[in-house]
Amino acid sequence: AEYVVESTGVFTTMEKAGAHLKGGAKRVIISAPSADAPMFVMGVNHEKYDKSLKIVSNALCTTNCLAPLAKVIHDNFGIVEGLMTTVHAITATQKTVDGPFGKLWRDGRGAAQNIIPASTGAAKAVGKVIPELNGKLTGMAFHVPTPNVSVVDLTCRLEKPAKYDDIKRVVKAAADGPLKGILGYTEDQVVSCDFNGDSHSSTFDAGAGIALNDHFVKLVSWYDNEFGYSNRVV
């Protein structure tokens, strides 16, 4: 095979993923964060890709949702600091019923019966693809009993004052322009099922966000964490 998508979640380092190269593959895409492989998010830093790189990471589905939105907001208004929460659909690593999960007791609780707080490196990883935001974002996840589609809540402090309508305008311009196909924009009264099979990395929900004032806002963006992410891998 010329290209191998490493999606087991096991071979996520350069050394381990390199086994595919030894097996005859020409390039490897890791569908997860990596400790040492270069990380790329389409629409954010993909232009920095160098053809000499044989192994790359496509980051997390949540990073692919957050990073394009964070880039647009930071480029236009400046993000001083921010906290992200993802309300995330069930994943393959969760338990069907309560069971052992090392020291992470909550992660071992039944996926279909609980809302489960969990850690995620998705927000911090944005700093790897947008260096100016390194150390300015962190976040957490709530795993919920739905089969697919997740949603990011980015609450951030802005450097430049902005009305919520200003934010909607610049996000829509990006969605219709340079980030078309990656960042979406909707003013419809949507819910999670509406995004099953949506190929965007991130769809900004204009009607769901709120502003406390011109410097402090909560922004909401949806993503099909399976199909949408798979489109970016391809």
UniProtKB/Swiss-Prot annotation:
Give this protein's Gene Ontology molecular function annotations.
Answer: glyceraldehyde-3-phosphate dehydrogenase (NAD+) (phosphorylating) activity; microtubule binding; NAD binding; peptidyl-cysteine S-nitrosylase activity
Asked whether the UniProt record includes Oxidoreductase among its keywords, one would answer: yes
Name the Gene Ontology biological process terms.
Answer: glycolytic process; microtubule cytoskeleton organization; neuron apoptotic process; peptidyl-cysteine S-trans-nitrosylation; positive regulation of canonical NF-kappaB signal transduction; positive regulation of type I interferon production; protein stabilization
Residues reported in the UniProt entry to bind NAD(+): 31, 225
Pfam families in alphabetical order: Gp_dh_C
Q: Where in the cell is it found?
A: Cytoplasm, Cytosol; Cytoplasm, Cytoskeleton; Nucleus
- Positions that bind D-glyceraldehyde 3-phosphate: 60-62, 91, 120-121
User: Any idea which residues bear S-nitrosocysteine here?
Assistant: 61
Q: What is its main location?
A: cytoplasm
Record CDD domains: GAPDH_I_C
The reaction(s) this protein catalyses: D-glyceraldehyde 3-phosphate + phosphate + NAD(+) = (2R)-3-phospho-glyceroyl phosphate + NADH + H(+); S-nitroso-L-cysteinyl-[GAPDH] + L-cysteinyl-[protein] = L-cysteinyl-[GAPDH] + S-nitroso-L-cysteinyl-[protein]
Query: Does the UniProt entry include the keyword Nucleus?
Result: yes
Complex and partners: Homotetramer.
What does the function comment of this entry state?
Has both glyceraldehyde-3-phosphate dehydrogenase and nitrosylase activities, thereby playing a role in glycolysis and nuclear functions, respectively. Glyceraldehyde-3-phosphate dehydrogenase is a key enzyme in glycolysis that catalyzes the first step of the pathway by converting D-glyceraldehyde 3-phosphate (G3P) into 3-phospho-D-glyceroyl phosphate. Participates in nuclear events including transcription, RNA transport, DNA replication and apoptosis.
This protein's name? Glyceraldehyde-3-phosphate dehydrogenase
Organism for this UniProt entry: Meleagris gallopavo
Q: Encoded by which gene?
A: GAPDH
